[in-house]
Amino acid sequence: LYAKRGTPLHSLICGGAQERGMRAGTENLPAIAGMAAALREACANLEQNAAYVAGLRDRLIAGLETIPHSLLSGDRKNRLAGNVNFCFEGVEGEDLLLDAKGICASSGSACTSGSLEPSHVLLAVGVPYEAAHGSLRLSLSAENTPEEVEYLLKAVPEVVTRLRSMSPVWRDLEEGRKSHVI
C-alpha cells in the first residue's frame, strides 16, 4: 500500500492487520505469481511482437488505401504498431461497424467513443470534418493473423461499397453536387 505520509486512510475491509491495519486478507499469491510470469513473457517478446503487429498494420493500411476516397488518419509510420484509423468519404462511421461480419471495430477515435460528433483528434491531425464522420478504428495485436487481415481487406471494401450505394451524401458527391474532400 502506497500513501503519502499524513494522508488520512480508512480501511475498506475490516479484519486482519495486513498493510498496517488498512487491508484485511491474505494476498492472492497464485495470481501475483501468474501476473509476474505473464509480464516476463510479454516483456521478453515485446520487440518481436511489435514488429509482427507493425507488419500486419502495414498490410492493412496498404489494402484499405486502395478504396477510393479513403484517408489514413495520422502519420503512416509514426504510430502505434497495432493502430489503424481510416476515414471513408460518404459513409457514416457508426454504420461502418462490422459486427455482422464478426469484426470488432470502433468509429472515431478512442477519446470520442459514443459521441456523434467527429473526433476532435482526427480534426486536429488534418482530417476534413466531412471525412471524419466516416472514421473506422481498427486495433491489432500479436494474437491476430495474416488471414484475419486478409478477411478485413475483403469485408471492409464490401461494406463501404454497400453503404455508399445507400448514401445520399455519396450520391451528391458522385453526381457533382458536392466536392470530394478526400
Predicted regions and their residues:
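Structural signal for hydrophobic packing residues in well-ordered secondary-structure cores
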Residues: 39-46, 57, 64, 68, ...
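Predominant activation on well-ordered alpha-helical scaffold segments within soluble catalytic domains
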Residues: 10, 29-40, 61, 97, ...
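Conserved core segment of the aminotransferase class I/II
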Residues: 1-50
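Generic structural signal for well-ordered, non-membrane alpha-helical segments
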Residues: 28-32, 46-57, 89, 93, ...
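Conserved C-terminal alpha-helix-loop-beta "cap" of PLP-dependent enzymes
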Residues: 84-137, 142
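Structural detector of well-ordered beta-strand residues that form the stable sheet scaffold
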Residues: 10, 71-73, 106
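PLP-dependent enzyme catalytic core of the Aspartate aminotransferase-like
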Residues: 118-182
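Conserved PLP-dependent catalytic core of the aminotransferase class-I/II
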Residues: 43-96
